[in-house]
Structure formats: structure tokens, C-alpha cells
Amino acid sequence: MKQLIQNFKTGELYVDELPAPSLSNAMVLVENEFSLISAGTEKGTVKVAQSSLIGKAKQRPDLVAQVLQNIKKEGLMATLEKVRTKLDSLKALGYSTAGVVKASMDTNGKFKVGERVACAGQDYASHAEVVAVPQNLVVKIPDNVSFEEASFTTLGAIALQGVRQANPKLGETVCVIGLGLLGQITCQLLAANGCRVFGIDVSNSMVELAKKVSKTESISRNDAGLKTAVETFTRGYGFDKIIITAAAPTNDPIELSAEIARKKGEIIIVGAVKMDLPREPYFFKKELELKMSCSYGPGRYDKVYEELGNDYPFAYVRWTEQRNMEAFLDLVALGRLNLKELITHTFDIDDAVKAYDLVLGKVQEPFVGILLRYPPNDNKHSKQINTIAKPTNGKIKTSFIGAGSFAQSYLIPNLKGLNVTLDTVITNNGINAKNVAGKFGFAAASTDANQVYQDKNAQVVFVASRHDSHAMYVEKAIQSGKHVFVEKPLCLNETELASIQTLMQNNTQSLVMVGFNRRFAPVAVELNNLFSKITEPKVVNIRVNAGFIPLDHWTQQAEIGGGRIVGEICHFIDLMQFFTNSTPIKVYADCISSNSIQAKNDDNIAIVIRFANGSIGNLTYVANGDKSLPKERIEVFGGNICGVINDFKDGAIYKNNKVTSLKSSGKGHSQEVAAFIKSIEQGTASPISFESIHATTLTTFKILDAIRTGLPQTIN
């Protein structure tokens, strides 16, 4: 399919052939007919990408702070690799489209194939022939509304949410500052609400358009008669409400709004404007009220609402972002809004770059609503494309399912120089698949994992997708006779584990490896070489200052990420098995009991594990510590010897009253990948036995049981 994309590193805009997106739960697959360019927002996005590295840093100081913090934690080189991965990426543009449903997995069965729908959402409702959009960001189009009009729906919902925040009453005076596309729609919504509307803009053409389309009394910001016009319009009182829909780097819109508002008036900010609020002479003396309007409305930026498809109760949240979208289309259907006169340009998707020449000012021509049109194309639903990248020449044909930042930083680069051919990279998002394929030299980019399993010549599958898909992809690999490396965790529950175990009992062909990398770190191997000679039981103490992860992060969702016990603590259980050379037989666990709604209690946990050979492991895992404390400390005791690893940056051996320092070179990511490929080349067993992988995974589930019951759990 064709899609407009931007190279975030170079800023280049172009239309490319990409694999069509795959469909997953709570999503709707839509074939676009039209999409709307949001000139203000998208111009800003494009200009950021086209700026220099210093320019990007100035516009996102929060990310600069993250980089500096990451350097302290992971070192300069590892951080540089992460930054390169982020910069060397392709970005989707657009967030307001209209088209036809081609398939749906929405949880309510609301959307049927062939229905006309409007779609919203950055990275979802993109300028592409086909899009996959979360169900709560899709609404049906009324019969008498055209695709062209419906493509305005996202912008309409943004404008409508700004009006709802203003809560205007019949007959109130409302000023709209900024008469671009968003401001023009806002003026029409206010007029439909029975308000007396006044518009201000720096552009004379936008002022005239507002007068023509919505019959809004409007004036240029630079007009010397502005204050007189405001006094006349408001009968000397000032405006009841002011809605700022402008995008401006200066403080002028906020200062002007304070000046022309009435005493106890309200200012609602919808656009991206500077907000240095001057206390004097107006905000304080007029007791002005300032409100923010958040995008399309309630539900925006809530992953549970947008990504999982969980709606808010109608009686308690009347106007969600989806219901705002519906309300906007209802007004269009009733003839209350005139959108056709706001459409100034329409381009076919092949000419999308020309549209952005208008937006960026490369072509000096007035514009308001710019639409992209999607003509018929027989290839728009293809889920795989071949790349022009020069493929690697190894013997082992290798594919990746999932290629996020972790895979791009720690897995794919470590295959370089090994006896592999990078065949196909599969992601849900065609942009990411194409980007990774080109960057690392994969022969093909795809959004359909089944193609890999059906390929008889494919030998190895790396699974680096979201945790809830791991078990399914591992099972398919075993069933199709392919070797599989899956990032932790192996699976999310005992049912999935039992299913994989059953397949492994009859498996004589596939190696299964889980990304428990720490046991492969050189400093860990050196310690283990010493302690493996000691036959008596050992004590292993591990302290992990893991750091806070918000409750709405996908890894914290039990059904998707499994939580940190299943998704992260498995690392350290495997490491304990490595040092004790034994399997867990019993586990004791308890977590904090906090009343904070921000804290996830089992992110802060103390665990004791008894091993079959009499060894003991103690794990303290916390999310409520301070970032300045190094993340991990490991201590191993046995045979009158002590070994220590400090955050995998250095270590020490304490023996015979002497201390021997150990140097560290990473957490074992490159070594684990090399060991896995070597075992395939030589036809030997997996570097980590399935029995050990099974024991580690089962122990994480028993830890959850121990917390729930307050009782120690036996591990069989």
C-alpha cells in the first residue's frame, strides 16, 4: 500500500510502498477514501523532523534529560545506540481519515465490512491507503455526509471539545483567536450553539473566510480598530469566553485574550501557544479563569480506553472522544456546519508531498482544508514487500516478529557477523517493518507472521513482540519445526506454559531459547566458573532497584504485559538457577501494602526461593527507590567464597582474605545471541535447557500465588 512518511533523521517527506497493517483485537481495518491534513499540527511535526539535532533537542528538553540519565545508567555507547535508533526512524503523518471497513475485530461487533467510517488517532488514522484503528477511535458516517466532509471528523472533535470546555450559554459573546481550520470549525460550532461569535487572526484571508463561511464578525489582529470593535461587539463588557485555536510561539494570544475578556471571564486554550501568564494587569484584577482543552476529549491518551477499547460509562462520561466524533458528524448531517467551503485543495496520495509544499510555505498560495484522496489500487492490501537492501549471506535463514527499540538495540545488531541471513521482519506497523528492514538489511518487510511459519526454508524465528503474543508465536514455531528465540517472558500464564510443555515433550527438531541474557554476561560466567566447582549449597542475594513504571504502561497490564513479576523478575530467577546449578522447589513471597493509587504493590517485593540442591536465593525487587542508586547488585556465597556483581559494570571475588576485581562488558546480550546461533550451527542443545526455562517461568506464577494466598508455594 502507499503511505506518506517522513524520515525523522533527515526530515525528508515521501510516499512509499509499505506492507498493509495487520488487524488485532479491538481494532478496525479501514480502506481510506480521504484524509485531512491538519496544517497547524502537521506543519509543526514536519518542521521538528527537518530541524538539526540541536534544534530537535531545543524543542524537546525533556528527552535530552532522559538521554543524560540513560548515560549514567547504561553508559555513553549504549545510549548513543538508543538515540540513533530513535532518530533513524520513519514517522507516520496524519490523524483524520474517512473510508470503508474492510475487516473488524472490535469487541462489540459494532462495525461491519463495507460500512463507511471516520477514523482518528496519530499513528493510526494516517495518510495511507489502509489503516488499522482502535475501535474507540472509529465512528460511522451518516448517509448524507460525504467522505470528504467526514475526513474532518478528528479536527471537528478537537474543536468541539474546546467548545465543551468553554461551556457557552445561549447569547454569550465568544471570541475565537486563530482562524485557521480549527478556528473556522470552532466559529461554526459556537454559532450553532446560539452564541455571538467574534474572530481574530493575523491573516486577512482567514478573517474574510470566517465572515463568508460562518458569518462571524472578524478582524485582523493588526487592525488599529481592534479594541474599538471588541468594545462595540461586547457592549463594553468584554467577552464572556475566549477560545484560543491559534498556534503561536509568542505570548501575544494569551495576553490579548486577558485584555479583551470581561471580568471573571474564561479563557480556553485549544491551540499550541506560549503560556507565560502575566499576573498584571488583567489576570489578577479580572479574576480570569484559564482552562485547557485536551485534544478530542475524555479518553484521549488513556491507553485503556484507546488501545484496549474499554469505553467509559455513558451516564458518567457523556462526551468521550468517540462520542464527540459522532456529535460532530451529526451536526454535519443536519446541515449546521459548512465544511465544503473550507476545502481549498485536494491531492491524490501520489502527490502528497506537493500538499506539504503548501503547508510549509514552499508554494505561496492560500489554503485552509487540504485533502488527500486514495484512488483504486489493486496492491493496497499486500502484507509483504521485498526491500532493495543487500541481504546478508549467512546460511541460517532468520526472521523477526516484533522489532521495537529493544530488538533494534540488543538483538538484531548482535546477529551481525554470525552465520545468518536476515530474511523477513514482521511488525503490526508497516512503517516500522520497512524501516527496520532497510536499516539492518532484511530481504523483506511484512505485517503477517504466518508467512514466516509457512516458509519451509525459514529456520529461525526471533520473537520480540508484546508479551501476550509470545506463547502463540513459540507454539507456531515448534509446530512448524523452526528454532525460536523469544524475548522474556516465555508466556503469561500456566495454561500457556502447559501447552508449550506438551509440544516440547514431542519436539525433536526445534530449539527454544528465552532471552535470559544475564547468565551470558562475561562477569556472570566468570563467577559461575568459580562457584560451579563448589558442591555445597549456595546463597544468592539479588537486589534490583528497578524504578517506577506507570500503572497504565502496557507491561503492567496483566493480559498484555503480565506485570513485572512475570515480565522482569524471571531474569533473576534464571540467574539464580545459573549460579546454584539447581532448580527451584519452593518459593516464599510478599509485597508491600500501600494505599497509593499510583503504586503497584507487587512491584515492591521480597522473594525467597529454595532450590533442589539445598541452595537459597533471596530477591529484593523495588520500584520505589531512587534512580541514583545503581540498578542491580548480585552476591553469591558458598565454600567460603563470595562473589559480587555491581550493576554488571564491575565485580569482585572475595577468597582467602583477598579481593580480586572483575571487569564487566555488558549484560550478555551479544553472547546469548551468539550462543543460540552456535547451537543451531553445531546441532547441539539450546544454551538454556527447556527444563530450566520451564522452572523459571513456573516460579514467576507461583510467586503471584504466594502473594495472593500468603503461603509458600511448592514448585513441581
PLM region descriptions:
Residues 148-223:
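Mid-domain Rossmann-like dinucleotide-binding core that forms the NAD(H)/NADP(H) cofactor-binding site
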